[in-house]
Amino acid sequence: MSASSSKGKGKELATASPLPGPSSGSANPAASLSALWAYLLPALNHIVKSPTNTPDKAPAIDIGFYAGIHTACYNYFTSQSETKSSAQARTAEPSGTDLYEQLDKYYIDAAREVILGAPQDDSTLIHYIVPCFNRFSAGAMSVNRLLNYINRHYVRRAQDEDKGWLRLNDVLESVAKTITADDSREKISERLKEKRTDELKQWGYKPDGSGATMASAEACAEAASPPDRIISVSSLAHRRFRTEVFEPLLAVPVVKGTKAKNKKIPKATKTTGIPLPKGRLARAVKELLESKGGDEEERVRLVRDLAAALRLVGVRPDHPLRKRLDRFLQNV
């Protein structure tokens, strides 16, 4: 074996080393939320935050630890259900609500770490955000598989109870205009289904396409939903990256010197020459797109990855920055 191949193999082994689980003598992780969270947290931190040479692939955990987490989640959900009486079951929150909310808080903190580490220089912002998001998203997808029991047991039940990304109240007003007193329940259900399809089309769903476009569009629609909606574990992470990272970077700064009663941003005119203020990310994109020289292939890659990230976290297709990125990519 050559020195170069040996060196490469050593690096690969170091990168692929899975995280071992806790000692077998540990307390029952399903005994309480605090015990379960203490059991999960090292795995979450390893998958979501550990440094890696391949940002598009999350670090692995030991197969025994992986199986132990599945078992602990199952036992925790089961024990919650068994301890509730029939009367409590009708009024209490579904089992798993506390774990789901704890996971949401975890993603809030993880996303805030990203924004706190952002450079102040606009010229390097996109070079920082794109790999950070790719790493965060890879971890989110890995955690989604690891905690799929939450999706199957808690998220699906919540969606069946009209607590998902699209609720009856969201579509009732528009659908109600076309509903008559003679319409059957099946016909009303079909109208609601059509409304859902229209929403998914905004995120790239093609009715005559593969099921992959449906899954991709629904993931984006979930991430675009308000924080009170129950969505899949991966979309939960992407939604928090939007609320804690992208939205602050997209926010337009308040114009100083304007009167309190007039909060509107002045329009740019040829006579005044006053430019409209832009958010940090918009300024960074402008600088990237208008820069001369440099690595053109790298610039296109950054733009493509940023456009994909904005879509995946639920930034609307009609957002000016998304439209600008799409126009650029159409011409390359």
Functional labels for PLM-detected ranges:
Residues 1-332:
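Eukaryotic scaffold/interaction segments
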